[in-house]
Amino acid sequence: LVAQYSDTHNMCEYDPVLEQYVAYCRNWFFSRRGIGRAVSDNFRRFPLSEEALWPDPTMDPDELWYANGKTKMPGTNDYHVMFPKRWSIRHDKFDIHLFTSPDNLIWHRVPGGPVCEVGDPGDWDGGVVAPGIGLVELPGGRMGVPLVGSKVPHKYPRKAPLGAIGWAWWPKGRLVAL
């Protein structure tokens, strides 16, 4: 257990290379939301998280990292990827980016901008897109992460049903191309 406020999805996994449990959760860095990381030998006891991702100098003052979407490349134990959701508070808009890590500790943003953005107004994903957890192989030579979409923005009054589920997908082996 850890006594920490985290109002978004959290994930915890056993890292066989580190031989420790690693959890990713909401964190606050200088009063701005970010992604926290906590590590423990004991699944029942975690320290407070430390900053893993926080708003960097390339981001606008109203932008922050909202949810982590941490996973691994399918079939690997040591190829870590994260699909964090960036929130522009001013525009009440989310988009999803791609980060990679060679060690489940140090994270780098893959250049090229968002890997997933909201759809057109009125579409099932026209207001919000949010990553799920788990990059998996899909039929038809694809791989993808679960995605939740909503027709209305995050701070817009809404009632059930709140959204729909879909996939953000790429051709297998083509998540990043050089």
Give the label of every model feature segment.
Residues 1-178:
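Carbohydrate-active catalytic/glycan-binding domains of CAZyme proteins
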